[in-house]
């Protein structure tokens, strides 16, 4: 569930660094650099983010105090603005105690010093003070050296304080990535049922997921959903069927009794999510002949699609890694729909990808269709399913990959959702084109050993995903 509690917002720390020995030597320098620091802090402000601004730190003593303040404030990320040369001893105590990633801002107040005006000053003390106001780059190697030796994760943005869209886009992406990391840290992932037997690639280490992403995993029983379904009343069912018609393109051959069956399960799912405060869900259930449980699972797709559209992504086949990937994509505002290879169109050089089960209604090209299926291929029973293509335009694929040495990494590819014929079989189904071509894309993607499912979202997000991986201590591999 997206983090909306005002007490649980992303907290971003910011401080500038300087050298107290300069202030009596160069008139106005301290005030000027404090002004730059306030300017940076102001530009970090945005909805859903609390900025903790500690101003200009210029002594080791102030640095130690700042470290305690950041820790008390529980900041998720620190922006270190280098205003001029400063001793690394005024930096280390701040970030060492906070124990969060650091973004070093090496931002000059202008594109270049006005050399002619500078050299006309005539007073070498004034000239030195002016130079020091442009001396942001000077201490960065010193700081980086110390951070490396202290194993403090850090990243850099280099550019200008003003008139530099590239630098400020980078900064915005760091905030966005930190916001998603914060959401994952507080996410409650429900897992209901069991794995699809024999799909060895999707078996996951839940402790490993918590180690990297944080959050909580809630183990759920299908019987709990069935019990909630028994409590649903007829008037609620009629209203939910109306919601189906409003939010999806229900095809004429969908039997009314199937829509009502799906509505009951959808309402029960909502209650399950609310009871356990879930932000995402992975599920699968084969069953042993219990009619009530089978009835629930066979009618789950419309309800899980509605949840996915609400920012509570649902992954079928108990695909926990992909539930995480879908939550990441949705938290970036890109959607995050469950998908896998379907086929290849070598004539058009596109990869067809889709899946049965939930689709992400908000990233559909047009209204998502609801179709009846007399069989769920490879699964139990029959019922209603959704058919959609992802919106035309740029897309990003994301897989959370478990490596042989017990680590997690993000695997990313950018492509384009293109128009053309699809398989009208009541599944999500899209055509994706990649700059490196369909053959090379598949070979390179598969080489990294992801599970056969991945999440697809709209827009190109590789820059943000790389930053998220950095904040989480993961590698990020970009295919293409």
Question: What is the meaning of each model-derived region?
Answer:
Residues 238-332:
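Long, internal scaffold/assembly segments composed of regular secondary structure
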Residues 93-120, 125-137, 303-317:
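Short, acidic/small-residue loops that bind anionic groups at enzyme active sites
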Residues 29-45:
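Short catalytic helix/loop segments, enriched in acidic residues and glycine
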Residues 63-75, 94, 266-275:
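Short, well-structured alpha-helical segments in soluble
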Residues 75-84, 103-106, 278-284:
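Periplasmic-binding protein-like
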Residues 379-480:
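Extended hydrophobic packing segments that form well-structured cores
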Residues 307-424:
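C-terminal catalytic subdomain
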Residues 2-5, 9-12, 51, 111-241, ...:
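Cap/lid and interdomain-hinge subdomains that line or gate substrate/regulatory clefts
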């Amino acid at each position: 569930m997206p983090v909306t509690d005002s007490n649980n917002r992303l907290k971003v720390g910011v401080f500038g660094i300087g050298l107290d020995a300069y202030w009596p030597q160069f008139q106005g320098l301290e005030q000027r650099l404090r002004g730059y620091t306030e300017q940076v802090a102001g530009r970090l402000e945005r909805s859903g983010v609390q900025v903790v601004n500690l101003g200009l730190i210029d002594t080791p003593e102030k640095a130690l105090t700042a470290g305690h303040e950041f820790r008390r404030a529980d900041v998720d990320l620190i922006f270190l603005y280098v205003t001029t040369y400063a001793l690394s001893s005024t930096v280390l105590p701040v970030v060492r105690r906070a124990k969060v990633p650091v973004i070093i801002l090496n931002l000059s107040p202008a594109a270049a010093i006005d050399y002619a005006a500078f050299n006309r000053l005539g007073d070498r003390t004034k000239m030195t003070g002016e130079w020091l106001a442009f001396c942001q780059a000077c201490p960065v190697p010193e700081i980086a050296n110390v951070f490396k030796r202290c194993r403090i994760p850090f990243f850099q943005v280099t550019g200008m304080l003003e008139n530099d869209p590239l630098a400020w886009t980078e900064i915005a992406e760091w905030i966005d990535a930190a916001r998603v990391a914060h959401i994952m840290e507080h996410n409650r992932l429900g897992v209901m049922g069991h794995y699809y037997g024999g799909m060895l690639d999707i078996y996951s280490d839940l402790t490993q997921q918590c180690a990297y992403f944080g959050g909580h995993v809630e183990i759920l029983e299908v019987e709990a959903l069935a019990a909630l379904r028994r409590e649903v009343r007829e008037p609620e069912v009629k209203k939910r069927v109306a919601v189906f018609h409003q939010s999806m393109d229900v095809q004429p051959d969908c039997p009314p009794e199937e829509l009502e069956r799906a509505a009951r399960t959808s309402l029960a799912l909502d209650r399950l999510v609310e009871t356990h405060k879930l932000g995402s869900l992975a599920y699968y259930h084969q069953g042993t002949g219990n009619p009530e449980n089978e009835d629930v699972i066979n009618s789950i797709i419309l309800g899980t699609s509605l949840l996915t559209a609400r920012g509570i992504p649902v992954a079928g086949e108990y695909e926990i890694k992909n539930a995480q990937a879908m939550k990441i994509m949705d938290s970036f505002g890109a959607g995050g729909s469950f998908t896998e290879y379907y086929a290849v169109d070598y004539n058009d050089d596109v990869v067809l990808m889709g899946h049965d089960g939930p689709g992400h209604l908000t990233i559909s090209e047009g209204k998502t269709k609801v179709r009846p299926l007399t069989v769920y291929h490879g699964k139990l029973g029959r019922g209603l399913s959704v058919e959609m293509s992802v919106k035309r335009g740029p897309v990003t694929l994301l897989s959370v990959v478990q490596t042989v040495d017990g680590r997690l990494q993000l695997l990313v590819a950018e492509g384009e959702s293109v128009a053309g014929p699809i398989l009208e079989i009541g599944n999500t189904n899209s055509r994706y084109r990649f700059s490196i071509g369909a053959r090379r894309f598949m070979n390179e993607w598969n080489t990294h050993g992801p599970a056969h499912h991945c999440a697809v979202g709209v827009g190109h997000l590789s820059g943000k995903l790389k930053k998220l991986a950095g904040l989480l201590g993961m590698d990020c591999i970009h295919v293409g």
